């Protein structure tokens, strides 16, 4: 049984806990969040506006969050180096604050006594691994890894199938992305991104994203061939990747569909999914796949030029991959 701690009990931290508690072999024994008291942690875990009420018993005391009778120790330390991970025999820390994404900052958990760290977001300095794409390259000597971003986890499996089967000459990605906690409820200051400071619930907001660039980190053969942007839209969850691709050789849309369907039933089962149904975004709430290819939504202009569409629950699907990475790291 791998002993796990979660640092940061926000959207991803709480959903990761929901998923981890259903996995055999993972024991979440501690949570740290300096901004949340135990009673508030219990409330936020129990009630979720997007994914619904937790189907179980949630209580707390002065020291613990108690879920279905299981006590999870709670701490409120600002500096990860001050956490008692050694005293708690923590094997892996899930770094979910969005603050300690740099490798040297995440290593504070190791200073505190943990053995390894999985960062729930892209990192400029820690190696990134995407399930189904390059996770087979992970080696046990690597102590800090990044699980990349929700959008990278959607795009990378799709891009890998396309690259392996047809060769990508160049590609542009747009993600139509649900609003997140970094956005504003009303117009407010956002010095680095003026548009990002506009009211999230009233606007479609063009934005930058590092997701496409991150894909080239896990698929180096696409370096210089892929970039992208985002549109933030007023939905609470579920996003969709729009990928426009120029292939290196002629291909039919049926061949593209067949290759993706084959991968979804084979080496990428559980990661990449395939549908021909007339779906919309809410159909994917709670979906644990990284990427769900929408075969009936794509279009083709010429034998080498196509637009492909793939959905993802940017909260639940990504959180499922975080837990997968914990399992990978624990077994390596």
Curated annotation (Swiss-Prot):
Pathway: Carbohydrate degradation; glycolysis; pyruvate from D-glyceraldehyde 3-phosphate: step 1/5. The keyword Membrane does not apply. GO terms for molecular function: glyceraldehyde-3-phosphate dehydrogenase (NAD+) (phosphorylating) activity; NAD binding; NADP binding. PROSITE patterns: GAPDH. Its EC number is 1.2.1.12. Keywords: Cytoplasm, Glycolysis, NAD, Oxidoreductase. The record marks 177 as: Activates thiol group during catalysis. GO terms for biological process: glucose metabolic process; glycolytic process. It catalyses: D-glyceraldehyde 3-phosphate + phosphate + NAD(+) = (2R)-3-phospho-glyceroyl phosphate + NADH + H(+). InterPro entries: GlycerAld/Erythrose_P_DH (IPR020831), GlycerAld_3-P_DH_AS (IPR020830), GlycerAld_3-P_DH_cat (IPR020829), GlycerAld_3-P_DH_NAD(P)-bd (IPR020828), Glyceraldehyde-3-P_DH_1 (IPR006424), NAD(P)-bd_dom_sf (IPR036291). It is an enzyme of class 1 (oxidoreductase). SUPFAM superfamilies: Glyceraldehyde-3-phosphate dehydrogenase-like, C-terminal domain, NAD(P)-binding Rossmann-fold domains. GO terms for cellular component: cytosol; extracellular region; fungal biofilm matrix. Its main location: cytoplasm. D-glyceraldehyde 3-phosphate binds at residues 149-151, 180, 209-210, 232. NAD(+) binds at residues 11-12, 33, 78, 314. It is found in: Cytoplasm. The active site is at 150 (nucleophile). Belongs to the glyceraldehyde-3-phosphate dehydrogenase family. Homotetramer. This is Glyceraldehyde-3-phosphate dehydrogenase 1. It comes from Candida glabrata (strain ATCC 2001 / BCRC 20586 / JCM 3761 / NBRC 0622 / NRRL Y-65 / CBS 138) (Yeast).
